[in-house]
């Protein structure tokens, strides 16, 4: 079946970057970062070997280790032309002078530069120089070694993709010598962020150079040595996570394949790593998931390790839950084990279907053409999402003059919108449920529209930074893809024989944002301009956000505003699948309208719309004064002359920095509208969660926008938000290992009841504690529990409440 796939973003996620079960599982994942890229990814999932590209994405400054901030080289001026030289000594000097940030640009440098910089002579000589430096490494990090190993693996990346680069056979032995020199130092297993920066490059070089077979002892050692002390350091997590890249890449290395089946110590280490209880819910949980995934992949090999592999997998499926505690590891292991082995051997057959019912348990029908399956949305969110899609549908048909007539052979009649509770949940569950990659911000699967009964799927997640009416990330943009595919483009995703990315992404941005796209105006002002001919040739290769989205938007908007009749004529061709005529049409536009396009841009930015920015706290209490500020709002070519606040409770203000008090608890959507001296306006929204004066500051107060639990296990000391449902059953392990136990609930709205038992799920006959105050503030304290498990029941009519269990606590949180 043909899939029309438009994946949003290349953001790294907590669980799988690969497809699940029906398609071959792929590589491990990387750590989730504070930023989220929200751009479209590559259409098809990667199932063949490729060297790892570029430097890993670094953490935001807010999470970066303070002592490493001086290493941020983002402002370094790079001169790749200076690297074009026949002298290896000069190249070494220039590489070390410019540093890793500039060497990183060689991954995407033009072919001419790569062919010069990565000659066999240069690779050999730099590997030898790296060996000399590595032998003298005493730990504590080294900018020089980090840069040199990055250069070496960039060379293999260039060789893989550049047909004009082919290394002579003596290059790889020299590279191996440099890796060996580093591995053999006394500092190889050091624990520090600075060391981790170098170690990361060394470990990925092992994979990129095709040396996966040579370093299995070191892989095993890292898995065995890993502990909570290592896990505290971001760069160590990033570095050691590379061992899973080695295990993944090894499947295309014959020497690796010949020996991996007998690596019993490695199989045990993978299983033990995946079963590390302290990793669950911790910052290295993604690594435990990767360990489970690579353990499952070992089932494809035969040898002495097979029994250990199966035993360790069985332990994972017994210790963790498919949907609950440790599910990231459970699902990762099930991903590969169900593909390479007999699923019945582990009792995991058809787990994907069961998982979908558990996760996407809410159903909401917007109309005969739109149905929502969601994990944890309120009725108000459902209604708001439906309303937004309904508005866009009307605006789309009006703007593109479709007559609401689908293209020929398109039998899609209802879109299914699948919404996960968070990007983390999307990362964990969307892969196995929909058989997609989740290293992105969402995905649209059209399926095969020519098949009657086909159901296209938009797969998304909630995010606090999304539209505050519904909090569904990319809803507006992605819904346009559905409409565009059904009413503008003949066939499925692979049908066009000419490039249409500029149109697909541009029209989605234009309909979703209309004339309010500050990012597009800013890309004109920063000088990163593209001609019409360049825009029309845009692909997803390289994921140039500006070119794909901003300039796609600008080209579409320009044509709609200045040449609408030409757009209508182009759509005649795309709706019939006449791609040769389509290509001739846009080529003519590029020749006729480039000068006009440039003038239009200048007119646009000379009277650019302002940018509204709200600065305020996101939570407060009833009767508490909250300060709101519009002072960070900007205008590209004038000044902001007026502001209008709507606080979401019927109150307004025209002050630039007002204060406001809310009279009742709840979630309020605050909007700010700013107007500039040219009369142009812009709007921003901000959500404020107000709790009652009796709320609990020690518990989450923003559960309206956070992930919620609808069941499963509680971890002592870790507050969680409760799902908005009548009854929730929760278990607490190891309650008999603590002398005292306190269970606290609070915040949100409504009225809940809290019950506890140490001898099974609470009912009228076995209660050991209960609390039923007015509101959500409940407290149970207990001591000397006899049994291992504690059982909690939360019931009532409530929303956005939180709960926490504390061990060795004689009183509840206040």
UniProtKB/Swiss-Prot annotation:
Belongs to the peptidase M9A family. Residues 1-21 form the signal peptide. It comes from the Bacteria. Its EC number is 3.4.24.3. This is Microbial collagenase. It catalyses: Digestion of native collagen in the triple helical region at Xaa-|-Gly bonds. With synthetic peptides, a preference is shown for Gly at P3 and P1', Pro and Ala at P2 and P2', and hydroxyproline, Ala or Arg at P3'. Proteolytic cleavage might yield three different active forms. Its cofactor is Zn(2+). Residues 609-697 form the PKD domain. The active site is at residue 478. Binds 1 zinc ion. Keywords: Collagen degradation, Hydrolase, Metal-binding, Metalloprotease, Protease, Secreted, Signal, Zinc, Zymogen.
């Amino acid at each position: 079946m043909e899939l029309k796939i438009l994946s949003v973003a290349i953001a790294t996620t907590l669980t799988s970057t690969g497809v699940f079960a029906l398609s071959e599982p792929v590589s491990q994942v990387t750590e989730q970062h504070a930023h989220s890229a929200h751009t479209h990814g590559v259409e098809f999932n990667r199932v063949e070997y490729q060297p790892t590209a570029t430097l890993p994405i670094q953490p935001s400054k807010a999470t970066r280790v303070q002592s490493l901030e001086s290493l941020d080289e983002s402002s370094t001026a790079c001169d790749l032309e200076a690297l074009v030289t026949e002298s290896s000594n000069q190249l070494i000097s220039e590489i070390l002078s410019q540093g890793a940030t500039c060497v990183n640009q060689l991954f995407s440098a033009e072919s001419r530069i790569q062919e010069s910089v990565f000659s066999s002579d240069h690779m050999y000589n730099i590997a030898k120089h790296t060996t000399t430096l590595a032998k003298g490494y005493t730990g504590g990090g080294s900018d020089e070694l980090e840069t040199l190993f990055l250069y070496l693996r960039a060379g293999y990346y260039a060789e893989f993709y550049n047909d004009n680069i082919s290394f002579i056979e003596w290059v790889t032995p020299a590279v191996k010598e440099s890796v060996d020199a580093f591995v053999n130092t006394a500092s190889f297993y050091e624990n520090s962020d600075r060391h981790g920066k170098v170690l990361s490059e060394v470990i990925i070089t092992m994979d990129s150079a095709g040396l996966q077979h040579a370093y299995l002892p070191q892989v095993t050692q890292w898995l065995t040595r890993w502990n909570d002390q290592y896990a505290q350091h971001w760069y160590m997590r990033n570095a050691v996570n590379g061992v899973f890249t080695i295990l993944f890449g090894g499947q295309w290395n014959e020497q690796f394949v010949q020996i991996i089946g007998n690596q019993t110590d490695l199989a045990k280490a993978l299983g033990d790593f995946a079963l590390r209880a302290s990793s669950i819910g911790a910052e290295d949980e993604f690594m435990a998931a990767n360990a489970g995934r690579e353990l499952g992949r070992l089932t494809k090999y035969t040898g002495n390790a097979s029994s250990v592999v199966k035993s360790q997998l069985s332990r994972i499926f017994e210790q963790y839950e498919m949907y609950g505690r440790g599910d990231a590891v459970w699902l990762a292991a099930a991903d590969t084990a169900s593909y390479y082995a007999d699923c019945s051997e582990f009792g995991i057959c058809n787990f994907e279907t069961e998982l979908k019912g558990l996760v996407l348990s809410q159903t909401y029908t917007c109309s005969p053409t739109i149905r929502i399956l969601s994990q944890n949305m309120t009725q108000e969110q459902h209604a708001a999402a439906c309303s937004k899609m309904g508005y866009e549908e009307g605006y789309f048909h009006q703007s593109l003059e479709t007559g609401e007539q689908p293209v020929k052979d398109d039998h899609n009649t209802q879109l299914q919108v699948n919404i996960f509770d968070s990007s983390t949940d999307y990362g964990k569950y969307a892969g196995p449920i929909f058989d997609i990659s989740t290293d992105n911000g969402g995905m649209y699967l059209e399926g095969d529209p020519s098949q009657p009964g086909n159901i296209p799927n938009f797969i998304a997640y909630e995010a606090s930074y999304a539209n505050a009416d519904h909090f569904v990330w990319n809803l507006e943009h992605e819904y346009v893809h559905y409409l565009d595919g059904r009413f503008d483009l003949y066939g499925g995703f692979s049908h066009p024989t000419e490039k249409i990315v500029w149109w697909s992404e541009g029209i989605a941005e234009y309909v979703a944002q209309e004339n309010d796209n500050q990012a597009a105006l800013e890309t004109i002002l920063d000088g990163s301009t593209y001609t019409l001919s360049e825009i029309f040739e845009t692909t997803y290769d390289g994921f140039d956000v500006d070119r794909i989205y901003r300039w796609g938007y600008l080209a579409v908007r320009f044509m709609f505003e200045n040449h609408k009749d030409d757009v209508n004529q182009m759509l005649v061709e795309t709706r019939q699948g006449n791609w040769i005529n389509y290509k001739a049409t846009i080529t003519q536009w590029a020749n006729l309208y480039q000068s006009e396009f440039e003038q239009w841009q200048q007119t646009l930015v000379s009277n650019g719309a302002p940018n509204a920015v709200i600065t305020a706290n996101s939570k407060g209490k009833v009767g508490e004064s909250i300060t709101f500020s519009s002072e960070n709002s900007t205008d590209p070519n004038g000044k902001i002359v007026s502001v209008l606040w709507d606080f979401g409770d019927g109150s307004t203000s025209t002050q630039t920095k007002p204060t406001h008090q809310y009279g009742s608890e709840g979630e309020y959507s605050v909007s700010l509208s700013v107007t500039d001296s040219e009369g142009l306006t812009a709007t921003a929204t901000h959500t404020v969660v107000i709790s009652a004066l009796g709320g609990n500051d020690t518990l989450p107060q923003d559960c309206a926008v956070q992930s919620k639990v609808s069941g499963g296990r509680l971890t002592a000391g870790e507050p969680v938000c409760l799902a908005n449902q009548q009854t929730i059953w929760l278990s607490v392990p190891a309650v008999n290992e603590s002398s005292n136990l306190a269970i606290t609930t609070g915040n949100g709205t409504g009225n809940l009841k809290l019950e506890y038992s140490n001898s099974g799920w609470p009912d009228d006959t076995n209660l050991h504690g209960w609390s039923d105050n007015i509101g959500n503030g409940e407290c149970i304290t207990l001591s000397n529990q006899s049994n291992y498990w504690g059982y909690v029941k939360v019931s009532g009519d409530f929303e956005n409440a939180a709960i926490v269990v504390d061990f060795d606590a004689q009183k509840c949180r206040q």
